[in-house]
Structures are given as structure tokens and as C-alpha cells.
Amino acid sequence: MMLFFSSLSDWLPGVSVFRYITFRTIAAMLTSGLIVFLFGPSIIISLKLRQGKGQPIRADGPQTHFKKAGTPTMGGLMILSGIVVSAFLWCNLSNIYFWVSLFVMLSFGMIGFYDDYLKVTKQTEKGFSGKARLSLEFLVAAIAAFVFLQVGSPGLALPFVKDYFINLSWFFIPFSAFVIVATGNAVNLTDGLDGLAIVPVMVAALSFALIAYLSGNINFADYLQIHYVSGTGELAVLLGAVVGAGLGFLWFNAPPAAIFMGDTGSLALGGLLGSVAVATKHEIVLALIGGLFALEGFSVVIQVGYFKLTKKRAFLMAPIHHHFEKKGWTESQVVIRFWIISIVLALIGLSTLKLR
């Protein structure tokens, strides 16, 4: 919306700054953060009154988690509200990549909201049917992938390799849908401790904001010899809103958390990250930058598969952050060490932009 005013620079001095992606990214970050910070307390009070007992606590989880009983969930509503308002203010509303990514984020958010709703109202750890939830997620992701295919190319870029792309043809759609769904659920699995998921999400969002900006600028893309995708620079503004909203949410989610993100937020943010990775042709780099999410997801897959084969557990508890809690790490140790891992992995992922 604010981009419109840049066309009035002849009459309004200074508004030409609105045309710059870098300025709008910072503005989106500040706007979303302020919205979440200001309206967060009232949202938390409202959710607490409506939810009563809050999110159910896993009976087989660490004993320290039982003191979290009564903490409201669906904190993703705070995050998504801040992102959407800020995005509509600062993003280019004619950009197709913006709309598709927003579609994925909000659709995944609605799926997560329904899951949270069932858990809270029925006071059970199991919400939405797993098969039904995945089916809806794949439908949303496939629609997004189809649109990306229409406006872009079906190529898969490889990190560390110059000017080489694998033509996926129509396999691009199922592959991209898998990336989006897998990322959404991996972030969802990571969201198990106070503050654990939101910081790695912000780290990944910042990293992909840079990637989106560079990929959408033909001069930078040519210099770095990365795939140029016209229009993806606008995703940096959207991701800036994610970072700002994440900072605002962390104020309330810092231990001891006053609110949990819930599936409403984790599915939505993960889906958005996957969507941006597909749009910018950095799907493989996402596995590095979002390596912590991949680790959490794989730990569950390994735990389930190993148990089916041997009737034993590979980890004391999955996802893997609970394994370390069972090993004796305090919650704050797990959270901060996982934050460090996410930052290191993001730096490694960003290094692929130059190491070719």
C-alpha cells in the first residue's frame, strides 16, 4: 500500500524512499513487531479466558513441563495478525510471489488453528486427523507450486555449482509441494519448548530475506551466479514482517512462556519458509539454513521407524529436543544451544551464495 505513495514523489518530497525494498523490509519489521508487542497482552488474556485449561501437556514428557499447564496456545494468531497488517502496508500488492506465499501461510495457519482448537476443546494431545491434515497441506502446497510453475521455471538449482539447473518438468509440482509441507511440519515439531522455534524461524526468515532480495535483483544474481527470479525481491519485505512479528512474540514466549505459538503459528511460518525457498529456487539451501528443523523432523521419523522394526526407541523421546531434556539438559540449555545451531547452519547456508 505504501508503495503507491512513491509515485507521488513529485508532490510529496521524501516518499520516493517507499520504492526501495530495503527500506520497506525494515519498515515491515518494525511495524509487525510493534503490532504484536502492543496487542499481545490483550490477545493473551482473551485466549486464556476462552481456553481455560490451555494446551494439554504430554503425559510422557519431562516432569518440568507439567508446570506449563494452563498456558494458552494459538499464539500464532498474534504473529499472523502482525505479519498480515504489516505486509499489506509495505509489500507490493501486485506481486504474485507475495500473494502465493501469503496464501500458503494463511492456509497452513487455518489448518493449524483447527488442530489447536480440537486439542484445547477436547483436552487431548491428538487434534486433527493426521491423514486429513496432510492431505489439506499437500493440496494447498500443490496449488502454490502450480502457480510458481506458471510464472517461473521448473529448474532446481544446486548449491556450490555454477550455472547448472536440473529441469524437473512437471515433477516440480510434487517436489515443491513436499518441500512446503515438510518444512511446515518440521517447524511444527520444533515448537516444543519456550522460545525454541521462534528464534530459528527468525534466523531462517532473515537468511531468506537476503536470498530473496539477491535472487530478485538481476545485478546481484549475475554477480553471485545464482538463479535470477524476477519479482522475488518483494518476499524480503514479507519476511521482514515475519522477523518483526517473531521478535514481538518472543517477548511473551520467552521462558516461562505466557503463551504458546501452537500449530496455528508453527505450521504457517514453516509453510511460508518452504514457499519462499521454492520461489527463490533455494530448496536445497533451505535444508542447510533450516537444518535444525530437518533434525527435529528426522528424529521423529527415525524414532517411529526404529520402534516399528525393533520395538525399541532410538531416542529417549522425540522430537530430539525432548531427548536432551531426558538426558538431563535444562530447558534453557536445550533452547539456547539449539538457537546457536540454527545460527551456525544459517551462516553455512548463506555461504553457498558465494562458494561456487
Swiss-Prot record:
Pathway: Cell wall biogenesis; peptidoglycan biosynthesis. It catalyses: UDP-N-acetyl-alpha-D-muramoyl-L-alanyl-gamma-D-glutamyl-meso-2,6-diaminopimeloyl-D-alanyl-D-alanine + di-trans,octa-cis-undecaprenyl phosphate = di-trans,octa-cis-undecaprenyl diphospho-N-acetyl-alpha-D-muramoyl-L-alanyl-D-glutamyl-meso-2,6-diaminopimeloyl-D-alanyl-D-alanine + UMP. InterPro entries: Glycosyl_transferase_4 (IPR000715), PNAcMuramoyl-5peptid_Trfase (IPR003524), PNAcMuramoyl-5peptid_Trfase_CS (IPR018480). One of its GO terms (biological process) is cell division. Catalyzes the initial step of the lipid cycle reactions in the biosynthesis of the cell wall peptidoglycan: transfers peptidoglycan precursor phospho-MurNAc-pentapeptide from UDP-MurNAc-pentapeptide onto the lipid carrier undecaprenyl phosphate, yielding undecaprenyl-pyrophosphoryl-MurNAc-pentapeptide, known as lipid I. Belongs to the glycosyltransferase 4 family. MraY subfamily. This is Phospho-N-acetylmuramoyl-pentapeptide-transferase.
